[in-house]
C-alpha cells in the first residue's frame, strides 16, 4: 500500500480485492441493469449477497426503470460485505471519443457526491471501465485522479482508496499517482 496526503485528505493505493477492503463504502463498476455481471460487479454481488440484489432491483423499479445511465451513481447497503455501503456507478464503454472521458470523470465524481450526501468519508474505488469496457488503463487512471482531486480540493478528512487488481496495474497506478499528485499538490 502507498498513501499520499492531499489537502487534508488521504489517498491510498492498494493491490487487492475491493470486496475485502475496510472502508465505509466501496464503489461498484456496475452495468446499467444493476443486477450484477462480470469482474468487480459480479464479485460485489456474489460476496454481498441477496440484500444488494434486492436493493438494486428496487432502485431499478423506483428510480432507474431504463437502467442506471453511464456517469451516474446510486447507493445500496453493503449486504454481507465489510463495507456498510456500495455505491454503484456505470462507466463508459470506451470508444475513443471525448465523451468517454467526461462520462468516466462523472462516474467518479458522482460517486463521491453520493458519498458526501450520506456522510461517508472513506470510499474505495476500482479501476472503473478498464476491464471489459475497454478503457485504456493509464488514461482512465489519470481521469480518476483528476475527478478525485477536484472533489477533494475544498474538503478535508476524506480517505479515498484506489484498489487495483494485479501487481502491474498497481505499480502503474502508483507511478501515475505520484507524478499527478506532485504536479497538482502545491
UniProtKB/Swiss-Prot annotation:
Coiled-coil residues: none
Family as reported in the entry's similarity comment: Belongs to the MacroD-type family.
Record NCBIfam families: PRK00431.1-6
Upper lineage: Archaea, Methanobacteriati, Thermoplasmatota, Thermoplasmata, Thermoplasmatales
Protein name per its UniProtKB record: Uncharacterized protein TV0719
PROSITE patterns: MACRO
Source species, domain of life: Archaea
CDD domains: Macro_OAADPr_deacetylase (cd02908)
Amino acid at each position: 500500500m502507498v498513501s499520499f496526503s492531499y489537502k487534508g485528505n488521504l489517498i491510498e493505493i492498494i493491490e487487492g480485492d475491493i470486496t475485502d477492503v475496510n472502508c465505509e463504502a466501496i464503489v461498484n463498476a456496475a452495468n446499467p441493469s444493476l443486477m450484477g455481471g462480470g469482474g468487480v460487479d459480479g464479485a460485489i454481488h456474489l460476496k454481498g449477497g441477496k440484500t444488494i440484489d434486492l436493493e438494486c432491483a428496487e432502485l431499478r423499479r423506483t428510480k432507474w426503470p431504463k437502467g442506471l445511465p453511464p456517469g451516474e451513481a446510486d447507493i445500496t447497503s453493503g449486504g454481507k460485505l465489510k463495507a456498510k455501503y456500495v455505491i454503484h456507478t456505470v462507466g463508459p464503454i470506451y470508444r475513443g471519443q471525448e465523451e468517454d472521458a467526461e462520462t468516466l470523470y462523472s462516474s467518479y465524481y458522482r460517486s463521491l457526491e453520493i458519498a458526501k450526501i450520506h456522510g461517508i468519508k472513506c470510499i474505495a474505488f476500482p479501476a472503473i471501465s478498464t476491464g471489459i469496457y475497454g478503457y485504456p488503463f493509464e488514461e482512465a487512471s489519470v481521469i480518476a485522479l483528476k475527478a478525485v482531486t477536484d472533489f477533494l480540493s475544498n474538503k478535508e478528512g476524506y480517505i479515498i482508496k484506489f484498489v487495483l487488481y494485479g501487481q502491474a496495474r498497481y505499480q502503474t497506478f502508483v507511478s501515475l499517482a505520484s507524478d499527478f499528485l506532485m504536479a497538482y499538490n502545491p
